[in-house]
Amino acid sequence: MKFLFASDSFKGTLSSRRTAELLTQAAEEIFPGCECAGLEVADGGEGTTEAVLSAVDGRRIPVSVKGPLWEQREVFYGALDENRAVMEMAEASGLPLVPKELRDPRNTTTFGTGEMIRDAIDRGFRDISIAIGGSATNDGGIGCMRALGVRFLDESGQELRGCGADLIKIRTIDCSGLDTRIKERKVRFTVMCDVKNPLCGADGAAYTFGKQKGGTPEMLDELEAGMQNYRDLLLQEFGVNMDEVPGAGAAGGLGAALTAFLNAELKSGIETVLDLIGFEEKLQGVSLVVTGEGRADWQSVFGKVMQGVGSRCQRMGVPAVAIVGSMGTGAEQIFDHGIESIMTTVNGIMPLEEAMERAEELYLGAARRMFRMLRAARGL
C-alpha cells in the first residue's frame, strides 16, 4: 500500500512535518513494508513558504528589508525553481514584528513587502505567489507600491512615505515610476487570500482588522476616512471600485493594491499551495491520503487544508481521511468535500492543556487506531 500524508499543523503542538512522521511510524507498524510519503502543507497562513519549499525541495532567499515600523530586518522568501517564487507578507510586515506597546495601524507600513517583491523580480522570478495573512498594517498597500516605484502625493505635491496615516493625505497617484516589468505584465502575481472583505465600510480593512493591530475607535475612524479617500483615487486611476472586489480589504487593504497596481489574482490559500507543490501529480498510485488539522468544525470547509486536500482527492478518485484534535459543530460538512472519515486524537475527557501537552502521544494513538480500522476493513 502507498500512503500520502498531508496534514496542517496543530497550532502550538504539532508541525505539519511531525504529523507525517507520526503517521509513518503508525503505518509501518500496522502495514509492514508499506510505502509512505509526507507533504508539508499550509492554507496560506503562517508557515506557507516553508511548507511549499519543503514539498518541492526549494531554497530560501535571504533579503534585507524595512519592517512594519521602518526598522531594518533580515527576512526570506522562497524559490521553487528559476521562475517561481513564494513569499509571506508577514515576514516583512507582520503583526508579531511590532511590540504590543507600539501597535498603531496609522504608523505601520508594507514597504518591506514591496522590497521583497522587487528583489524577486530583480532576480528573474516571473511567477510570484504572495501570502498576505498576519499583517500589522492598514496602509492600503501604499507602502508596498511605493517600494515598487509608485508615488503618492499630498496637496502640495510632496511624496508621502507610505503608512496608514498617509491615506487621508493622498491627492495624486503617480504610476509613471512603477517598475516597467510590472507595467508590461511580464510578472504574474497570485495572492493567497481567503477573506472576502471589501476595502471600506463596516466589513472593510479598518473596522474589521484594525482593532487587533492596536487601533482605537478614534484611530479606526481616521483610517476608514483615509481608506475612502484612497478608494476614490483608485477608482479614478483604474476604473475599479475596490468596495466591490472581494478580498480588497485583506491585510489592511494590501489586497486592493496588489489587485489594482499589479493585476494580481486573489486566490484561495490552500488551492494555491496545492498547485505550487503539484499535489495532484503526487496522488499517482496512492492508496489513501491522511490529512487533518487541530479542530474540525463548520469553518473547515472554507479554504482550510482538509477541504482543499479532500476536494483534490475526490477529483482524482483517491480516498482521504482525517485526524483532528477535536470536532465541533458542523464538522460533518467536510464529508461533502472528499473526506471519508474523521478520527479525533482526544481519547477521553481531559482539559485542553493536557491534550496539548500529550499531543504527540495522542496523535500517534489515533493514527494507530485508524490504520488498525483500515486493516480490518480490508478483510471485509
What is the predicted role of each segment?
Residues 1-132, 136-380:
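N-terminal loops that bind phosphate or other acidic moieties
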